[in-house]
Amino acid sequence: MQEQYRPEEIESKVQLHWDEKRTFEVTEDESKEKYYCLSMLPYPSGRLHMGHVRNYTIGDVIARYQRMLGKNVLQPIGWDAFGLPAEGAAVKNNTAPAPWTYDNIAYMKNQLKMLGFGYDWSRELATCTPEYYRWEQKFFTELYKKGLVYKKTSAVNWCPNDQTVLANEQVIDGCCWRCDTKVERKEIPQWFIKITAYADELLNDLDKLDHWPDTVKTMQRNWIGRSEGVEITFNVNNYDNTLTVYTTRPDTFMGCTYLAVAAGHPLAQKAAENNPELAAFIDECRNTKVAEAEMATMEKKGVDTGFKAVHPLTGEEIPVWAANFVLMEYGTGAVMAVPGHDQRDYEFASKYGLNIKPVILAADGSEPDLSQQALTEKGVLFNSGEFNGLDHEAAFNAIADKLTAMGVGERKVNYRLRDWGVSRQRYWGAPIPMVTLEDGTVMPTPDDQLPVILPEDVVMDGITSPIKADPEWAKTTVNGMPALRETDTFDTFMESSWYYARYTCPQYKEGMLDSKAANYWLPVDIYIGGIEHAIMHLLYFRFFHKLMRDAGMVNSDEPAKQLLCQGMVLADAFYYVGENGERNWVSPVDAIVERDEKGRIVKAKDAAGHELVYTGMSKMSKSKNNGIDPQVMVERYGADTVRLFMMFASPADMTLEWQESGVEGANRFLKRVWKLVYEHTAKGDVATLNVDALTEDQKALRRDVHKTIAKVTDDIGRRQTFNTAIAAIMELMNKLAKAPTDGEQDRALMQEALLAVVRMLNPFTPHICFTLWQELKGEGDIDNAPWPVADEKAMVEDSTLVVVQVNGKVRAKITVPVDATEEQVRERAGQEHLVAKYLDGVTVRKVIYVPGKLLNLVVG
């Protein structure tokens, strides 16, 4: 064994061994308990970042630990390979998305191997291959036949100059990112999957997810947004149709003073025929981004349509306004406004001088003060005719019942959740397998024509999708008749909604899933990824599992038993102000810093001499240039050091602050472990441990070893507090470093301890542990070694510490056998000089003894 720890030599050697032995390849084995550990698959952007490294290290630690428990562990990896960035990169680099993507996959695969992750590479998949997306296309056609897929027009961001649809992130300040033209809202036909048909089940089954974070479940509950309310119909004077609105607060209905409709509503369109101001407003609304988040923060605007609706209960006429905060695609495209008791309605009414009528009393029973804001709390009604004096629930029911009896109201359950629009007007995605015949009939692509393959050898102009630009690509024949293919592609959330299931049978050619394999491995035991995926991906992931269950492919209701959302990785961020006042962000690697005595940064500059402004720790990002390249760190310190720091610096679900000093600390610790094993093995063979012949000191050290095993097992397995597990191993290492190594049993005990330490560290730092296990002559490869088991007998204390007090004041602490009687403890206490001094010449009037803990002698 060499004296120095050289990760650059051992890590590549160990990785080659894993590859050659196919150590982490697994198959179904009914005789073993399975464990499926999955980290969210990466987008092949070109290089791994620290967020990836953290996610995948957590997964690998759990997978390796479960493997050492003797389970059949599946840990696969693949590539979420379709998506918009590839199109941008292709245009920029004058290539096609496919070669750019495949080059990135090859590069990032090497980076993953360099970090020592124990993946079953035989199951690797890339979602952009026809072998993968063919089954998604087939499944989509089956959903269509079941009535779960439909087409309708829906609003998109449209660039009139490029004649193309833009994703929300391609709209910057209301303009096209490419040509700076003002973006419009445009209605175009798109494909939808009926996720709303599963809304109740998606909501109710959240209660089954005991091991998902409450934050994620709450976000999904709110996103699904089930509400109980009343749908109310209003007559409108001089208008051919009625207006229907939905409210969850019928108790406030007597305070409704106006209605608001979307700019695209037929009533607004009709009113605009003779109203130039309204027509201009409708035009302006066309330029509103379709993202819901934008809607929440933008300025609320409106124009009076001139139409008057009739309040069904009071008979009063109330104005109908067109407003930019009402969307046609949400609900009926019309809302009722109660400005006294809804803040948005209040702000709009205040801005345009509309009537504000209070109908709910304040908590103290007084009339509410509406001079500054609306009263949004529930309460007792007033100013509401026959409903005065009713509380929220009674008023809800009374008003709902009255509207129903009049034929103008109906109780309804509503959902905030909308059906999933899966059409994207992009090129780099899976083609949607639908065709249109010459007579206008729309139908699924026949099975014998699947997959509909996306051509990869294309030229990107950055404007139009190559399959839309090439009229020949769309032409096909179905049942002998000419037909046109759909040129939209799937939302890339489609691919990431079922990949976890395909990992169980990636080579299966008879269908989407081999049910036998899928049902052996599924559900996933632990799924690891960022909380930013809480609603979109994690909801579609759950939805797809239910769709596959109902298609008879899987027999479970939910895709993953446990969800672990890892925290973000933060790093120092610095900038200097350029000549034009712009911020130039400087990498923390290039910042020369001065710190105060507490280690805080007080001054910084870069190599060019710019004075840097330090903005604190923030999420590693390209925009702030504060990402740290994992590859550089691995080359400098080794993969094991980077992995150990990642797991030690912070609890897995909290933010992690990147500190190179911490990385250096992790590296020093591994050097200490190496040194201790080196010194131990240099002394030659070791005798067998004889636990009955150990001295008290040896027993105490062995007790520490086994208590550490018990703690680390609990920390990794049950609590998943990996940082405290590492801290416990470090503490034990400090004790081992000080332990005597001269006697035969000293060395035998050290051998037992080091074999345990190396196995406990193995999930975190597998390369060094693989090597040290061999040097310690552990049986077989450590990858197949069992997790150490704490010896209950070794952990039993044979002595205990008793605090001795005289008149309630501590005078000594004594060590006594655990089975010592009160008499023996008193006798032993009396031998202590400090105790004897206070007992001299006095009478012990009372003895308070708490066995094994406290002896209090009351004297006088």
Curated annotation (Swiss-Prot):
Top-rank taxon, per record: Bacteria
GO MF: aminoacyl-tRNA deacylase activity; ATP binding; leucine-tRNA ligase activity
Transmembrane segments: none
Alphabetized UniProt keyword annotations: Aminoacyl-tRNA synthetase, ATP-binding, Cytoplasm, Ligase, Nucleotide-binding, Protein biosynthesis
Alphabetical list of InterPro entries matching this protein: aa-tRNA-synth_I_CS, aa-tRNA-synth_Ia, Leu-tRNA-ligase, Leu_tRNA-synth_edit, M/V/L/I-tRNA-synth_anticd-bd, Methionyl/Leucyl_tRNA_Synth, Rossmann-like_a/b/a_fold, tRNAsynth_Ia_anticodon-bd
GO terms for cellular component: cytosol
SUPFAM superfamilies reported in the protein's UniProt record: Anticodon-binding domain of a subclass of class I aminoacyl-tRNA synthetases, Nucleotidylyl transferase, ValRS/IleRS/LeuRS editing domain
Chain span(s) of sequence motif 'KMSKS' region: 619-623
The EC number(s) this enzyme carries: 6.1.1.4
Binding site for ATP: K622
GO BP terms, alphabetized: leucyl-tRNA aminoacylation
Reactions catalysed according to its record: tRNA(Leu) + L-leucine + ATP = L-leucyl-tRNA(Leu) + AMP + diphosphate
Pfam families per the UniProt record, alphabetical: Anticodon_1, tRNA-synt_1, tRNA-synt_1_2, tRNA-synt_1g
Localisation: Cytoplasm
Motif 'HIGH' region, residue numbers: 42-52
Protein family membership: Belongs to the class-I aminoacyl-tRNA synthetase family.
Name by which UniProt lists this protein: Leucine--tRNA ligase
Gene name of the encoded protein: leuS
